[in-house]
Structures are given as C-alpha cells and as structure tokens.
C-alpha cells in the first residue's frame, strides 16, 4: 500500500474487514502501481512543463486552460480552424498544426507532455504516437474506443515510463474517496448491487438515414478528422431539420460524433468514466463475467440507441462478494429502485434558485479547473433546501446508488455529494478516517506526475482496465444476448460477432504505431 497515505487509522468497527480487503486489492482501482518517476530525469517541480495539445476547440479548450496558468503551452493542433478559433486567439504566438503527426515531428524537442482531446476513435493512435516519443499524456475519456487499444496504451505506458492520466476528473474528487472508505469500513455491509444512470445522450442517437453529401467547409480538414475511420462523404445535415445539434455544428462534428459506432462510444463512453468512477474505486471492479444489454429503444444500423439498460455481472474480488451493476442511459428521470424511500434525492443534488452557485447542485464554472476536488454533502444546506421545495432547481438525472446488505450510499455525476440513504442519516454522521491519498486536483495530479511525483490517480494502470470493462458494455449495445468474457484471452467465449468489435480497423495510410 505504498501509494496510499493512512491518516489516523482507527482500529474500531469502521475498519473491521479492512485488512483483508485491501491486501493486494487497492492499487487495482486507486493510484496504480507504476514506480516513482523521480529518478527518470524529468523536470523538477519548480520547472514548467512544455505542453502541446492535440485538439484545441471544445473540451480541449478547458483542458488547455486548466494547465496554462502554471505551465507553458507550446504547440496546438486541430483539424477544424472554426472550432479552435477561440483557443488559437488566446495563444496567438503558439505554433498551430492540423496534422498531429507533423506537430510531433516538428516540435519534438520543444514538447514534454501532450493533451489528447479528440473524438474517441483517434485517442489510441494519437496517445501511442506521443508515448513512443517519450511524451507524457493526458487523454480524455474514454481512454480508447476499443479494448485492444486500451491494452496497447497500458503496455506502452509501462514500456516508455511516461506519466499518464485519463480525463475522468471525478476520480480526483473527495467524494469518490469518501464512498470507497465508507464501503471499506463496512458502513452499508456487503455491496452486491449498483445502479448508475444518466440523461445522456444530449446529441442525436438512433437515426436511421444519413443526409446527402455536401461540400466540406474551408475551415475543416475532413480527411484528417476521419483519421483511422473509413472514408465517407461530408454532410452538414443542417437543411433537413431532422438532426438536432444543441451545440451547433454539423451532422458528424464537432459534437455529434459521440453517437456513431465508428467514432464514439455513445452515452456509456461519454459518462460511465465519470459516474462509474466511484464504483470502480470503491468496489475494486475488474473484468466482468458477463455483460448484456437488457433493454434498448430507438435503434440504428450505424448509431447507438436512444435509450438503453445494460447489466454487468462481476465476480467476487478478494473478500468482496459478486456484484451486479445496472447502467441506464437516456433517462428523463432517476430510475425507480426498490428500497429507496419515496421522495429521496439520488445522485446529483438540487440547489436553491437565487442561492448562488455555491449551492449543492451549482458549482462555480471555474471549479472545473486545475485544483477542483468536488462538491461535498452539506447537512445544513440539505435542511435549507428541504424547507423551500418551491425554490429548488433540479439538475439532469445523473448519479449512482450502492445497495448494501445494511444500507445504501448515493453519489453524483463526478463522485460528488456522497451521502447515506436516507440522507437524514447524515445529520450527525462522521466519515471514516481517511485512508486514501487526497488529490490536488485532476490536472495538478498529472502535472505533478510529469515532474517526477507519484503516479496520477487515473494513470493507465487504472484507466485502461476501467475503460476495458466499460467498453464491453458498448459492444453489448451492438450484439444481442448475454456476452461471456474471458479477460485472459481478451475474447467473448460465446459470440464471435462481438469479438469483431474488440479491435479497430485502420484506413489505408494510418497506423497505430
């Protein structure tokens, strides 16, 4: 347990089964087992990193902004000048590229680390090219689009000894650690069932036709955007009125790609790395025995469905019993779960209208940046909200529920606002003594690792196995029936069609390494 800091470890009922639980298990879903980087010749904590970014618009802009206050941004790459315009203006003097391969070649000596924030289908190749050149990488979630790519990146991180982090910010949050420590302390007994839900997709899914071909905008390099994926005509879809995009843009990009089999991983790929972060850490989840999509609506030959329910069956892990995890997406409201008291708030908390952004459900926008470690449950705020129901604003339904033999715990989207159910149990509740190292914030965690510090909390030793089991659910959306998985052979034992989706195909002229 070298990677963990034990503070005031109590030898009371809170940790009655902790020793046997943690023996050999915690690093699997905590901070990983990568050796310290201090002797690897990396920059000292007082030196600034030279960071490049593959992707400059959209989510990449906030990743870059989170690193810019303390580090140097030295190169930017984006295939879409329109999407990247605001970031390019902010960093006017920084070299700009459209092809990430050219950027890595031209700027090799100037770059220490790279942010990879592009559509899912390009994560694997881009991260691999960076690591092969000795660059530390911060890769947005999901780590990859396929299981094979996730395993390749894990092996590369070990081989090239670079600092890594997946962009599932909730893994750094205080609440994620709180729920792990509560469960390890036996607060709700044995956990054999977990439910997790999201309102995503907030982009089109389940479409059944593709609009006619249109000219490619001058600002977009369509060939580079497609990357490893098969060539297809560009279309905006704007004139049909059938393809809504809440964030502007075109039929495939810059945002709708998440819903397509060839480019994204649907709602599960978008949000599971956040919402299921707390279950992954607390329950030490590894490969499931089986996965099955047990319900789906609005299906398509080339897109993920509009709504789905997926069931994962995990075997026993050490002294932890088998657990069944249910994933719901396309939710308009929180699923009704047996045993939850009527009117109980699950997942993300509401907040008081006019109460400012510091309320339970409304964090400041800047809080998502460098040192943010999440919103915590506050009993006084909870009481105040219960007294003024007419002034409450409810966020979209997102969250998770742990069902134990002695009680329940719920968490929000990013492992925040951890609390027992019913929440009245929190009035005089004292959390267990901290066992896990606290994060300085997801970006600082990675930057520290790049400078020789301890491995980041969602380094690829953690992120790759997490991504792998999540991606099995993505495959289950495309194949009917229960899929039985052999992690040693990396294959489904009862469905050859499903095995086709474990590894990507590469368009001619594109190579993974």
PLM features: residue spans?
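Beta-strand-loop-alpha-helix segment that lines the small-molecule cofactor/substrate pocket
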Residues: 119-120, 124-172, 186
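A structured beta-alpha segment of the ubiquitous adenosine-cofactor-binding alpha/beta core
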Residues: 95-111, 116
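N-terminal Rossmann-like dinucleotide-binding module
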Residues: 23-91, 170-173, 183, 279
